[in-house]
Amino acid sequence: MKKTPENPTICLNMIVKNESHIILRCLESVKDMIDYWVISDTGSTDNTQQIIRDFFTEHQIPGELHEHPWKDFSHNRNLALELARDKADYLLMMDADDQFIHPPNFRFSNLTEGSYYINCVLKNITYARRHLIRTDLPWKWEGVIHEYLECNQPYTTPIYPDGYIIASTEGARGQNPDRFKDDIEVLKAALQDEPDNTRYQFYLAQSYRDDGNYEQAMIEYQKRADMGGWEEEVYYSLFEVGRCQARLEKPFPQILEALLKAHYYRPIRLEALHYAVVMCRMSGQYHLGYHLGIHHIETPVPENDVLFLASDVYQWKMKDEIAVCASWIGRKPQAKELFTELSQMDNLPEEDKTRIIDNLKIC
């Protein structure tokens, strides 16, 4: 099933387990852009398999449903990948709780690269994830958890310009109340075998944070930062050290030092600096907050960064914080100018827009 790069064939590739409550939304979002599907079920006890069969029968899309016992994420994803490798020009990787948002009559076109990132949105965080891979390259999943695609031949991975994926934690894995504790044990064991694996170390820190253990998360994030490697991940680890300190109510100077260390490590990113300004405002340090952030209110979203971009920080949140600080230190005209600009934006949450309009009235 091969076509030209202008009109490539696409095969949906997934692993699923007990996704009956969510799977239809995902399938509906991709049905018009795929030519084939290969899905591996890893042990569903609900009617996930029947829903998949019925859906693709109704829409007359050929494909295959397989069953494989569960071992770990990379093992099971690799089984599904190998079964799909000869079915199309490209594989589209999706999770059951993903939803592809795209223009009407959308099809992937002009595909020539070895793989493509697709922008993903999880709450207010934007990141890019490799979702499309060319099947004539030896792709393989790596990692027992938080798995990723790797290839031992040269390839390029641009961001596909159209469409984006709304990610969530509504799938079966996300419903497990002990998910983060389970992940911690898996990652600790994996790090015993691969102590220099920076990805495992990063997600160990993430798992401690998500489980609410900020003290241990802070330690693990610092370990990850000290390991070096991918600059975006080092930056985010340093940022989270500061955020964990804030959650633990460490002294203000200590928190500020950690956040500024993160910012100066990667100054094209604003998340850490924005959080520092927030901490200044909350501590009544309005002059300090103003001077830290005033020269960064027009900083654009970095074009080539892909890890956990808080796009709202760049779009409006930094300006909002600086406007508040400006109003407190007597710079009313500047505060009014910023609040006016913010009040005219269309993408603000309603409660924030109401607050900003109220602030504008008293400038």
What residue spans do the PLM features occupy?
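Acidic helix N-cap motif at the loop->helix transition within catalytic regions
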Residues: 24, 46-55, 103
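A conserved acidic beta->alpha catalytic loop
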Residues: 29, 39-52, 69-70
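"A position-specific structural signal for the A-helix of alpha-solenoid helical repeats
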Residues: 203, 240, 275-278, 321, ...
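Short, well-formed alpha-helical segments that are part of the catalytic scaffolds
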Residues: 14-36
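Catalytic-site signature of metal-activated, phosphate-bearing donor transferases
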Residues: 1-2, 9, 74-82, 88-94, ...
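Residue at a conserved register position within TPR or TPR-like alpha-solenoid repeats
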Residues: 208, 245, 276-280, 326
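Conserved donor nucleotide-binding strand/loop of the catalytic core
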Residues: 50-79, 83
